[in-house]
Amino acid sequence: MSEISYLSINNAHNGIIIKIPKPVRFHTLSEFKKYIQQSYSIDSVDNLFLLTTFGIKLNYNLINEIGEVFVYDKRLFTNIVDQSLIDQYTQSTFRVSEPTHSPLLKSNVGFLKQNLSSNLKINQGWARIITQDGELMDQYCRELIQQINVIFKCLNTIFQFATNFTNEIEKNFSNFFNYVKLINYKTLHKSWITNYKNLKTFPTFKIDNENIKLSDFLEVDRLQSSADYIEKFLPLIVNKLNELKQVIETVNEEKLTVDKFIETSRNESISNFKNVNISNVLSQLQTESQQLTDDIENLHYKNMDEIYRLHRDKLSISIYNNAKDIYKNLNDLQQFKNKLTKASLKAFNTIANLQMKMVGVKTEMKKITTEDETATEDSKVGDVNYKTISNVKKYEDYLSLTIDLPLIFGFSLIEKRRQFEWYDFYSKGIVNNVSEQLSTIIEHEKVFRGIWLKKFGTLLSLINDDPLTPSLPNIDVTLVGNRQNNFSILYDLKIERDDIINYISLIEATNMSKNFVTLLNKNFKDLIASTNNMKKVTKVISSLSTYTTNSADDKSKSSHEEGTEEEIDFDLNLIKGLKSRIKKLENLLHQQQFKNLNNWPVIRNVPSMTNDNRQSTIIQPTVVSPARTNPTQLLSRNPSTTKENTTTNIHNNHQQSEVLDSSVIDKHLDNIRLKKLNNELQTKNTELTNQINSKNETITQQQKEMEHMKLKTEKRVDELMKKLQEKDEECQSLKQENKIKCDEVENLTKKLELSDNHNKELEAKITEYTQKATSKTKEIADLNKTVSNLRSELGDAMHMKNDLLSNLSSKEAEFTKERNQFNNDLKALQLKLDEINEDYENLMELTQAKQKKHDLIINDLNNVIINLMNDIKKTLLSVFEYFLEYCLVLESMGLLLVKEDEIYKIKRVKGLKSKKSIGDGDMSIISNGTPSSKVIEEIENEINIVNNIPPISSILPDSYSSGTESDSVVDRYNDQSMKLISTFNQLFKFNNENENENRIDHILNTLAFKNNVQLQEDSINDTRFFLNAISKRFRDVEGFAKRQAKDNKLKEQEHRKLVHRLNSKISVNGFQEKDLVLFLPTRIDRPNGENIPSNDKIQPWAAFNIGAPHYFLKTEQTKNKEWIIGRVKKITEYKVTEENVQSLESNPFQLSVNVTWYLVEADEE
């Protein structure tokens, strides 16, 4: 008996397995999904997602060929999952109570033996219960382990599905990306100008008296427009593909995170449960429980105390510990399963997101790789589609012609020459040779068949009157299609091999790539090889007819020499073929002259012919004597042998004839041919008439036979009909004997009625019917036996029926008694129900009053809560305002609040104060500024949660008091409470990350700045965050001010020293007031070289200087002094002009025009 195979349905979220026997009874996929939906309690069939092994989508046509199906709930793949749905999958179905301690540890036992024995038996029952719970927990643990393994298997399957989905798209993208990358790497839109200039330097050459310049084939405007188009759209294409590549890289990173999550979860499960062996613990528990039972069964008064101590101090504790371990393992497995189920939601969401991203990539790839007829080229600026990329490729190819045009032109020259040689030189020759050779072969066959018919045709006509008319096929080999004259850029130029050689040498002489020369030479060698191959084909075809002209002697000779000569040279075959063609033409000419010479009636010209010979000719018709050689000898290579054979035949048939002239012979031969044809036609006509008469006779005979057969068949049909009626009667008798087989007999009658249409098969069918009738009689006999058995069984059943009826009557009497009793009880219960309804109504009135009071209290509490929540909102906003003031104070001092690595810090930022002064104007108004810290935005986003608190007017009733609400207002309390509860949960519910902190606490802790902060300095006296930073800043500023004051004092002292030193030093340039200057007497250069006595003029005193020559001392006449040292009091500037150049007041020192001089007033020291 074959084993039953099952289809396993695995739930990916709770690990539950459902097994269905094969073949699956569901005919369609919708029915199968409906069954899964009902089994796993999923809302809708549309939420199901089914996969098979290796992440392949389910193909329901192969449902009986697969072993596992993995079920996923699509609702768990979304970004936000309903908590009730998560609870549905994480809800535990195992109900096991925690093991309790032994009752022996709790009881106070005296010295009575009876108490000991009863406590031991109670402990035995406790151990039995613990053991049963342990076995149940062991079973639950096995189920949990199986479910966890199923969840891991489902995670691997969905990951394989995502990997398969993304890999295919990524592979297509990589191929296309490499293609575009290659275009971008080899683009010519920037370097085509230099390539085109190099192409223009290529020299002009001549082919077929035509001067050709390669650069003329390219249009400069088209090249420029192509380059512009590529320059515009190629960066857009590359950027588009780079964006898609970044998306694919993010998808791969997300795949790695999912894979890492699965791997870490599996490693965690291995590390947590690899040392757990529940079966050993359970076996130990069962062994100890069995030992405890055995001890109680063998209990005696002598060893009761020892057994009691053993059970209390050792066995009971060990049993409890083992049960506790099993219970702990069960809880650990359940917690790990719930944790894995919740953590896998992120993996499912990641897989759904990456799948959507890859769908977007696939859509973009379809847009740029497949042509869309509805899309217009460059429909939008920056839009990249298939048309754009194909245009870039086309334009790049056109730009590449600036480099590859010499090579492509050379390929075109070689190809056109190859086609010319193939078509003109050889294809026509091959066609003509084939036609001629095939017609020659047909002529050989025609001659052979004519000679053979002359030899054996008359003898065969005696056996069969059908004429033997030889028919041979006609051969018409023609070359269809015109030669291509216009060959692309070469047009109708005639290309010679010398032109190709000259062109290759021209390229070799220029600065073109050496690879061009190599490729062109290789292509030219291929041209020569193609032409040589066509020559060989032509040689072979021209010698085809030689294989049908060999005589018998030639065949024997060739077979004899076959061992010595293994190969025949093609050139020799060609020569032999040409010779045979010449001989064939000679033979055809000779054959036309002496055609049918063997049938020439030479008997008339022989006088010595006797009657016996005539008698023999009547008895034996004239038969052409068989040729001594092969009939194809008429076309043999040696014409001399052919002539000898024909002359010997003529000599044997015409021993006494004279040599005739050729023209007379031809006429005579024509007459003979016509007479012979007439005789043949007459004989054929008589034969055909005889055949027609004989066939008419056969037709009449066959008609008579058909009538006779018809009569026979009618008689036979009558007989069969009689037999059929007899069989019908037999069938009716069979029907009367057994009504059970009436359906089969009706089928037989129908078959018999249908047999009227098959007259030729009636006899065979009747024999079959007789055999069936005999078999049916046997079956009827068997059925009669079964009927008798059934009748006996029916009698037994009737007896049983009577017994059951008697029992039923007695039961009915009992039921009537019970019914009466139940009616009485029902009346009593109805009375009690009425009393309970009255009590219930009274109770409902009381509860309604209490409920109304509770509703009023709830309303008051709601009002209190909303007031408190609004006060909390105001408090938080005011605290936030204080926080802003702190930040503004910090920034006014050059400090900035920042958050680095989840830690708040206050840093000194250079230039912050100047920036604030530039942006805000007056730094004195701190409150009007806006802080620059980015932490404020983060805290402001967190504190915006308090905006969800509704104002007092939005949630309180229109008129609220503590005891005068109407019923309609009371009905609104529930909605108000639900709104407050939802708002309260948003603010004060503990989050998952920190079980001990809600959102309001988090905001307050953040604004307190006590945790996750870094102080500016460690101080025992000051640990407040802002105060610590401000005090440190003040101390830094105070220290800086002290250092500056000290530095200023030192600099003032140095300044005094320098001033004192400078006051005692003589200045030599850059004269200013209070400078000490040395004046020396100097002379005045007169314009005419005259020297005026010094007594008449002022003696000039010039300042001793470096680079400042026109500083003169304003003083009276000083005599008997060689130098004067004075401190400058005032410096007056003057300038000599053309007006005052002669004035002694304005130009006392007679300086030149446009000279600037200074008059210095100084006190002599």
Swiss-Prot record:
GO terms for biological process: autophagosome assembly; autophagy of mitochondrion; cellular response to nitrogen starvation; DNA damage response; mitophagy; pexophagy; piecemeal microautophagy of the nucleus; protein transport. Its main location: membrane. Disruption phenotype: Impairs the transport and degradation of ATG8. Also suppresses the degradation of both LAP41 (the indicator of the cytoplasm-to-vacuole pathway) and CSP37 (the indicator of mitophagy). Keywords: Autophagy, Coiled coil, Membrane, Protein transport, Transport. Induction: Induced during biofilm formation. It is a peripheral membrane protein. InterPro entries: ATG11, Atg11_C, ATG17-like_dom. It is found in: Preautophagosomal structure membrane. One of its GO terms (cellular component) is Atg1/ULK1 kinase complex. Residues 239-304, 670-853 form a coiled coil. Pfam families: ATG11, ATG17_like. It comes from the Eukaryota. GO terms for molecular function: molecular adaptor activity; protein kinase binding. Homodimer and potential homooligomers. Belongs to the ATG11 family. Plays an essential role in both non-selective and selective autophagy such as mitophagy. Recruits mitochondria for their selective degradation via autophagy (mitophagy) during starvation, through its interaction with ATG32. Works as scaffold proteins that recruit ATG proteins to the pre-autophagosome (PAS), the site of vesicle/autophagosome formation. Required for ATG9 anterograde transport from the mitochondria to the PAS. This is Autophagy-related protein 11. It comes from Candida albicans (strain SC5314 / ATCC MYA-2876).
